[in-house]
A protein has these predicted regions:
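A flexible loop/linker signature enriched in serine peptidases of the S9 family
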Residues: 83-86, 103-113, 129-137, 151-179, ...
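Hydrophobic beta-strand positions that form the internal "hydrophobic ladder"
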Residues: 99-100, 148-149, 212-213, 256, ...
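Residue-level detector of Asp-centered blade-edge/turn motifs that repeat once per structural unit
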Residues: 94-95, 143-145, 207-208, 251-252, ...
């Protein structure tokens, strides 16, 4: 995921649960987030403004950069949790007290998986470090057992792998080396949970049962699947040509929400041609929601958006009547991504964020009282993406 325009599209389109985020221009971090090897701990973040260290790599005082916007009426007491580099896709555990997130900073060539407390303290890396044979990673979630599930390429060798071939235009690579892994709470004893001959990633978890939903192209198309927390009972959930990905369960696990492309004609031919090269062109994605049947398949699928733009990172409110998603539909140039809220039937849409750069990857806490999201706001260095926590106000 990368988080800035025009790289913002990379953010919705990098291998991730939700989508891409803008790319950072620098990786200076203040304060530095400790890795699992240092066993150190960061202090909790301070509401509304960044910590009193006041400089994030380019000398601008924290007070000069806006974290809380007066016209974002649903967000109060906005708190910055990370400071510098690329930090995105922060997801709550079932208790609402911990988060996993993707982090790229301090000169790293690709994202690593971190875990931290919901106040921003105790940041540490839980995916293998490059020094220990780590690879490219994406999309992590905490199971009810406290184990961490994520996708990684490190089973096929260390390193970040090559970037996608830009001669094909703006494309995102669905690395066939991605497999789904599970590890202990601090990243210990990682093992493969699901592996096919192709791309297996974007795993998220039902907080009630631990069932996992993910994306795979093992049948030749990018489809949604689900499985038990131990890797058993794998079921294919979608069967329509196009990229189905970035799926999440609702809090009660009765619904699944995701983003998908539905190309036809020449666009379908282009999609299938690129997929044979492990590439996806992610400029047109819509939001879908479906009920989860007793046999764990999907039923009563509804298309929520139909605007032909890049829509991604959907997440259900715990009341199951509303959802959040991220879109560039408000910017004629397609570079500014904001968070929107809409009813499940597509009515009553409202813009939630107004920051004139990137806001994305929203997730409600299990009780619906908090919202965690990623943003380019309050940047210490141009291109930084950080994680923010806010009180949600209806």
């Amino acid at each position: 995921m990368r988080r800035t325009a025009p790289l913002a599209l990379a953010l919705i389109l990098a291998p991730a649960c939700a989508a891409p985020a803008p790319a950072a221009d620098a990786t200076t971090t203040t304060p530095p987030a400790p890795t699992s090897e240092t066993a150190s701990e960061t202090a909790p973040a301070t509401p509304t403004t960044a910590p009193p260290s006041s400089h994030h790599g380019h000398g601008a005082p924290v007070a000069d950069r806006e974290v809380q916007r007066a016209d974002e009426r649903h967000l109060k007491n906005v708190t910055q949790l990370t400071f510098g580099g690329e930090n995105a896709e922060a997801y709550f555990d079932h208790t609402g007290t911990e988060l996993t997130l993707q982090v790229k900073r301090d000169g790293a060539g690709c994202d690593a998986i971190f875990r931290m407390n919901a106040d921003g303290s105790k940041q540490r890396q839980v995916s293998p470090t490059m020094a220990k044979g780590g690879g490219r990673t994406t999309c992590a979630y905490i199971l009810p057992s406290k184990q961490v599930v994520y996708a990684s390429t490190h089973g096929h060798g260390p390193g970040c792998l090559d970037e996608p071939d830009r001669s094909q235009g703006y494309v995102w690579k669905v690395y066939p080396e991605f497999d789904i892994w599970v590890a202990g709470p601090e990243g210990e004893n990682p093992k493969v949970l699901f592996k096919s001959d192709g791309y297996d990633a974007e795993a998220t978890v039902c907080h009630k049962t631990g069932r996992i939903i993910f994306t795979s192209d093992k049948t030749g198309d990018l489809e949604l699947y689900s499985m038990n927390a131990d890797g058993s009972d794998v079921k294919q959930l979608t069967h329509t040509p196009g990229y189905d990905g970035g799926a999440f369960f609702s809090e009660d696990c009765s619904k699944v929400i995701w983003r998908a492309s539905r190309p036809t004609g020449d666009e379908l031919a282009d999609y299938q041609r690129l997929l044979k090269m492990h590439l996806v062109r992610p400029s047109k994605l819509e939001i879908f929601v479906a009920d989860v049947a007793a046999d764990q398949t999907l039923t009563k699928t509804v298309q929520v958006t139909n605007n032909g733009k890049a829509n991604f990172a959907p997440y259900m409110h715990p009341d199951n009547t509303r959802l959040l998603y991220v879109s560039n539909k408000g910017d004629p140039k397609g570079r500014d991504f904001d968070i929107y809220m809409v009813k499940v039937d597509g009515s009553g849409e409202e813009r939630i964020t107004t920051n004139p750069s990137f806001d994305g990857f929203p997730m409600f806490s299990p009780d619906g009282k908090k919202l965690v999201f990623s943003s380019n706001r309050a940047n210490g260095t141009p291109g930084d993406t950080n994680v923010f926590m806010a009180d949600w106000v209806d």
